[in-house]
Amino acid sequence: MAVAPDGPVGAAFLDEVRMRHPRLRLQAVSARFVLSETHAKKILALSVESDRLGILLANRIETDILMRFALTSQISVAIRDAGIGPSSRDIFILIAMGTARDLVLLHKDLEPLLTEPFASDRAPFLKRKFHITHRAIDATASSAPLEDILVERAAVLGASIRPPPSA
């Protein structure tokens, strides 16, 4: 769900929502880093599968999700770039995992702040931020090449920080 704060919210907002909904796993990602709904679903699938296999990029799945959207293996960089800052007024995507009942309660709680998540085109920002060239997009045989490049880069993050399997 996309949240449009009516004033500066920052990390305190996320902490408050976590206190009101302790059974949910929550992470806020700057809307600029989420290309589309399918991009978000693919990144979440990567994190959930990594959690299942015990190969998260960080100790918590919430942090793993943020790192994959930010395309970095550094937690501090992910928080700085793709997280919500202490006085942020930017729209952010709130990723929530839990039971259907708890998710409905969260939706009701945040309903006045919800907005259209993909109203603006984030492709130019993402191409610039992650140095994705027109040539790379043209070389990708896909109906959504930018999305696939972003997801592929998020998937290989784990390979760059995990030790090789022992023989």
Question: What is each model feature region?
Answer:
Residues 2-62:
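N-terminal interaction modules that seed assembly of large macromolecular complexes
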Residues 14, 18, 44, 76-79, ...:
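Generic detector of well-ordered alpha-helical segments enriched in charged/polar residues
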Residues 41-97:
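Ordered, amphipathic secondary-structure segments that act as subunit-interaction surfaces
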Residues 9-13, 71-74, 102:
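Helical mechanochemical/support elements of P-loop NTPase systems and associated helical scaffolds
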Residues 21-25, 82, 86, 114:
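Conserved NTP-handling cores and scaffolds of large molecular machines
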Residues 85-167:
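Glycine-rich, aromatic-bearing surface loops/beta-hairpins
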